[in-house]
């Protein structure tokens, strides 16, 4: 009998248009996981509304993120692709877990602390409870592994703590997940300020490349990317702008940083930047084409997310019913 595949859960918020960082740092890696694991890839729209969204934009981006998953090579026949709000168990489980969470542990979350410093008392309760919803997302599917970046590791630790606490209080209910850090997978930094991660919420549009950016826009943004006055392509922390561009090229082409440094020995930044830009354009062109085709066939896309929600709902409801029974709620 063949071993049961381990379960992976991951998702992206449709709170902004997706960037090259989302693609190279997450989605491209997910495509490599689908053979080996039973994958649940979600568009986490309920997380997006912790900050007010324009309804039409949220709907557009939710479908676009789903289309990007598929266009990047994630097979909807082999994986469970769905929209978070289409599986009501996420919201229900989140409340049950909220009642097993502590104010202290939630207020210690770095992202919440950073945002509350800026926003004070006007910070939304949704941002405070965000990590509990994330815990529900993961625990509902009994995920073994969760691909996470460093910025989400603290939230995953909390999910583990909440899951363990529930198991200890009510008997074994959840698999306690591990963080999955892929061997490959670059952390792509801001093109204008390489000390921070490339982010779709950046105020300066030259700092990020969107997956759906036109080729000429990509070329322009890379040509304006911050480098330095050294003029030599080196992979070193002293040249963070150049290092970031090397990481982008390596993530796309499969080179090692040393190989890139050798390739551009004696060559200037102009040629190097030009090659990085062309590599990005070449990588994203087929993805963009497929995304446009998928968004042009809303019926086919709807079929995919409805089928995905059905499959996700089946798994999530099994866990939710266990939770309800153990807590003492009367089955409906």
Curated annotation (Swiss-Prot):
One of the GO biological process terms: tryptophanyl-tRNA aminoacylation
Binding, L-tryptophan: 137
Keyword ATP-binding: yes
Transmembrane segments: none
Keyword line: Aminoacyl-tRNA synthetase, ATP-binding, Cytoplasm, Ligase, Nucleotide-binding, Protein biosynthesis
Motif residue range(s): 'KMSKS' region: 197-201
Residue ranges annotated as motif 'HIGH' region: 14-22
Binding partners and assembly: Homodimer.
Protein name: Tryptophan--tRNA ligase
Native species: Clostridium perfringens (strain 13 / Type A)
